[in-house]
From Swiss-Prot:
Originating organism: Saccharomyces cerevisiae (strain ATCC 204508 / S288c)
Gene this protein is translated from: SLX5
Domain notes: The region between Ser-201 and Leu-335 is required recruitment of SLX5 to ub-hotspots via interaction with EUC1.
Swiss-Prot/TrEMBL keywords: Centromere, Chromosome, DNA damage, DNA repair, Kinetochore, Nucleus, Phosphoprotein, Repressor, Transcription, Transcription regulation, Transferase, Ubl conjugation pathway
Span list, region EUC1 interaction domain: 201-335
Protein name: E3 ubiquitin-protein ligase complex SLX5-SLX8 subunit SLX5
Amino acid sequence: MHSDTNGRTKSNNSPSDNNPNETVILIDSDKEEDASIREANLPVRLYPDRRVGRRRDALNRFVRSDSRSRNSQRTHITASSERPDFQANNDDITIIREVGRFFGDDGPIDPSAHYVDLDQEPGSETLETPRTIQVDNTNGYLNDNGNNNESDDGLTIVEERTTRPRVTLNLPGGERLEVTATTTDIPIRRSFEFQEDLGASRRQLLRRSATRARNLFVDRSDENDEDWTDDTHNLPEAIQRARRESRMRMSRRIAERQRRVQQQRVSSDENISTSIRLQSIRERIQSYTPDIRSAFHRAESLHEFRSILQNVAPITLQECEEELMALFTEFRNQLLQNWAIDRVRNTQEEALRLHREALERQERTAGRVFHRGTLRESITNYLNFNGEDGFLSRLWSGPALSDADEERHTQNIIDMIQEREERERDVVMKNLMNKTRAQQEEFEARAASLPEGYSASFDTTPKMKLDITKNGKEETIIVTDDDLAKTLEDIPVCCLCGAELGVGIPDDFTGISQKDRGVSFEGLVSKYKFHCPYQTLARPSMLDRDLSKRTFIASCGHAFCGRCFARIDNAKKKSKMPKKKLAQLKGSAHPDNYGPKLCPADSCKKLIRSRGRLKEVYF
C-alpha cells in the first residue's frame, strides 16, 4: 500500500495471502497541512526578518551556502502489521523505528534566540541523530476491543535514547570551552579569531568577557574542587601545557623583578658609600657649616647653589667662591655618573631577560600546534599576541645587545655626561672671567710693570724691556735678552726664603755653613736678599725638603714654597703668645720673621696670614 497526495491510504488490490507478514504501509507527511501549520505559528513582525528563508541544520543553526546538503528534512516512519488481516482499513500498525528531524529549512524561528555559526563543526549530513525513539503497540494501551477506529490505537514507549546537546565555544587565545546547552542558549558569535587589527584595550575587554563567560559555568571559588580538576581534560594538551608554561614564566618574571629591584637598592647604596672619590668629596663637604652642606643636596644647578649660599653664607661665598663652585660641580657630576652606571646596568639586565624570553618563544614556536579554524591560525600566535610575551616581543622586535654593543652604549652615555659637564664648566668659567675682567686687566698691568728681579712668568729665559713707537704711540715690549741668555738664567724662587720653586731646598744643603754660623740673622738677610732665607736652617728635615717642593701663590701674585706656607700658618698661633715670651724669640724663630703678616716682597703690603690668601698651584 502507499499514500496518495492527500495522505489517504488505499489498497493496491494485490494478494497478501501468500506472505501476510510482509505487508508494509509507508506514510508520508502532508506538505500542505504542514505549511498551513507553519503559517499559523509564524510570529507577527513589524520589520522583515532576514533570517526567514535561510537553510538550517538539525540543530536549527544556519547552514553555510557551500553546504552539500540541499535536501529538505522530513520525517520517515516505517511500520509493519503485527498480524495478518485482509481488511486494509482494519490493520493494526506496529511502529518499530522513528527518525525525527524536527526543524526544516524554512521552519519556524524563535525571535528571542541567538545562533552561532561554528566553523569548527562538520556538515549537517554527518551529524549524529540527536534523538532516537523506538515504540511498540503490542503491549500497554493497545485497544483490543475489536474497534477498527484508527484514532483509538495507542503506543507504548519501550526504549528512548537521547543525546545531550553540547555546544563548543571559541574563547580568546585559540582556546575552546565545551558546555551543555540547548540551541536557544548559544551566545552570539564573537570575533575572537581576528584580533590582529584590534587595540590593546579591545583585546583586554575581550579577555575579560571570556573570563565572565567561563565563570558562568565554573565558579572561581570551586577551582580546587574535584569537578573543576576533572573538567580540564576537555582542553587540548597543547593549551594546558601553554598555560602551565605561561604561569611558570610569569612567576619567574615577578620573582626576578623583585630580586632586581632589591639588588638595585643595595647596589645603589654600595656605589654611593664605597666610591672613593665620592667619599672624599663628602668629607670635604662635611668641613663646612650645616647650611652650606644642605645647599649641596638641595641645589640642582650651579646658579641655584650660588643663590642659596648668598642667602645663608655670603661671607663664606665671597672668600671661597671658586672652591665651593668647583666642589659642587664635582659632587653633582659624581652623583650623575653613579646614576648613569646604575641605569646602564639595569638596561643590560633587561636586554638579557628579553633575549632569554625571545629564545624560549622561538623554541615554543618551533613546536606550534594548529587548530581547525578557517584560517588555520596557530595557537602559539594567539598566546604570544594576547599575553605579555607578545606585547614585549612587539616592543623588542630586534635581537638583544651584545657585549660590545653594551660597552659602546655605556661609553656613549659617559661621553654625553662628560660633554654636558664640560659645557657647564665652560659657562661657569666664562661668567667668572666676565666678572673678574677688570681685576685681570689690573693684574696684567701690574705684571707688566714689575720691579727689577721680579717676573710674572716661570720662564727661565732672561728678558729685557724695549720702548718702541707704534702708530705714533710709545709702547714697552718685553723681548728675550740673547746676550744674557748665554751666561745667565732666571730662576723663580720663594719670596720669603729664596728656595727654587718646584725644586725646593737643594740636596747638597745640609745646614748652615761655617761662614754663616757666626753671622747674625740680620746679616744673613742682607746677604741673601730674602726676608727669612733657608740658609739659616741648622739642619733641614725630610719634611722641610718635601714641603719646599710645593708652590703657593698669594692673592697679590707673589709665590711662596710649601714650607713657608706651613710656617705662615703656624705663625698665627705663635703670634698669640704673651709678649714676654714672644720677645725672647730671636732671628728665624720669631713668627714675624718666618711668617710675616704682610707680603715680604718689595712695595707689597698685602695680607698673607688670613685664610684663603695662599692657594697651591701645580705644574
